[in-house]
From Swiss-Prot:
Its EC number is 2.5.1.55. This is 2-dehydro-3-deoxyphosphooctonate aldolase. It comes from Rickettsia typhi (strain ATCC VR-144 / Wilmington). Keywords: Cytoplasm, Lipopolysaccharide biosynthesis, Transferase. It comes from the Bacteria. GO terms for molecular function: 3-deoxy-8-phosphooctulonate synthase activity. It holds the Pfam family DAHP_synth_1. It is found in: Cytoplasm. GO terms for cellular component: cytoplasm. Belongs to the KdsA family.
Amino acid sequence: MKKVVKLNNIKIGNDLQFVLIAGPCQIEDEDHALFMAEKLIQLTSKLSIPFIYKSSFDKANRTSINGIRGLGIEKGLEILSKVKSEFNCPIITDVHSESQCTDTAKVVDILQIPAFLCRQTDLLKAAAKTGKIVKVKKGQFLAPWDMKNVQTKLEAFGAKDILFTERGSCFGYNNLISDMRSLAIMSELNVPVVFDATHSVQQPGGRGGSSGGERKYVELLAKAAISVGIAGIYMEVHQDPDNAPSDGPCMIKLDHLESILIKLKKYDKITKEE
């Protein structure tokens, strides 16, 4: 039986309607978080797409020491808690160390393990021990079949609900490429799989002191991934991405999201009717 992860009234599975995980790269302030959450909830409700709000309190792996990291865990969780109570929507955010897991799990519904940290055993253990859903991004350096080892670790530590995410693989210097076979390979582990359409177009360190990106390919890759048959699409979204504090070149402009989602719904329906 294929694994389905249940979150409130949302069912996440590779054979089910895709779930959208979306929000701004980092939490900028309370007003912005509430604004983005409201707009995304209105849009996904209109299109009948299950939705999970995403934003980060700390971007701990910025390219440069001068990169804006975010508001930090205390203020960040306070804002995410406000979003959750205001809109009654599920929340996902990143954790970067074992010490962050317990406090973060008190607020959010899903703990996300960043790609660079996907093999960190103690972090996986701490996340699993919270009892929350754990979503792990496959490292840019990792083969998809090697995610079996991540799955085994999490299950050994008691994790019941696991999600895996594809976010591109290193392709030479300052570049990533998306191998859509990865989605099928990770699905064979009986884990719901999500495609990160925005980080997959990232050009790591491509601007010297910051990462670049090719936003124009986000929709193309998202449609390709949905056509494989997956559980979810992950996209970072901003009303003014070119002036966002992080990952601007990769993020989708809020005004463009609806047209993309309408197309993704069509691709998803065709794929899962076969």
